[in-house]
Amino acid sequence: MKLFLVLIILLFEVLTDGARLKKCFNKVTGYCRKKCKVGERYEIGCLSGKLCCANDEEEKKHVSFKKPHQHSGEKLSVLQDYIILPTITIFTV
């Protein structure tokens, strides 16, 4: 019975760092660690006093969004923004 109570108490124990690493803030794709791994670079400090380690390989995977080309001379009319499709209703039959 005592062992059962100890197991129940351990289930509700909240770990400070847990199994999952905390992510950095300020749009940095990295994790807060005490020491950075090989191939990672130090960006900024985390709130817990650890280093924000960002992986160069991960940042190369993310491609920045490019805005579509805007026509400077001509303006598109409202009619060209959408197409009216023919529909069949009860009243047209």
Curated annotation (Swiss-Prot):
UniProt keyword annotations, A-Z: Antibiotic, Antimicrobial, Defensin, Disulfide bond, Secreted, Signal
GO cellular component, one term: extracellular region
Disulphide bridges, residue numbers: 24-52, 32-46, 36-53
The keyword Secreted is assigned to this record: yes
Subcellular location: Secreted
A Gene Ontology biological process term: innate immune response
Residues forming coiled coils: none
Chief localization: secreted
Signal peptide: 1-18
Family that this chain belongs to: Belongs to the beta-defensin family.
Function according to Swiss-Prot or TrEMBL: Has antibacterial activity.
Name recorded for this polypeptide: Beta-defensin 128
Species assigned in the record: Homo sapiens (Human)
